[in-house]
Curated annotation (Swiss-Prot):
GO cellular component, one term: cytoplasm
Source organism of the structure: Caldanaerobacter subterraneus subsp. tengcongensis (strain DSM 15242 / JCM 11007 / NBRC 100824 / MB4) (Thermoanaerobacter tengcongensis)
Name of the protein in question: UPF0291 protein TTE2340
HAMAP family found in the cross-reference section: UPF0291
Major localization listed first in the record, in broad terms: cytoplasm
UniProt similarity note: Belongs to the UPF0291 family.
Length: 68
């Protein structure tokens, strides 16, 4: 799950990388955090789309049961 602390840390590492640079450990941490963040966003979008298509499909089937 994406927490505020995760977002804060991603932002902190990003700004530090632009100002003074990151250690190898920080670069690895930044990579892992970004990977986890992107993975969760993708899963969230997939769930939303699955729900959307399920709703659209469900609605579509109902339209055939009566005359418009």
């Amino acid at each position: 799950m994406i927490t505020k602390e995760m977002i804060d840390r991603i932002n902190f590492l990003y700004h530090k990388s632009k100002s003074e640079g990151l250690t190898e450990e920080e670069k690895e941490e930044q990579r892992r955090l970004r990977e986890a963040y992107v993975k969760e966003i993708k899963e969230r979008v997939k769930r939303e789309l699955d729900n959307l298509f399920a709703d659209a499909s469900h609605h579509h089937h109902h339209c055939h049961h009566h005359e418009h």
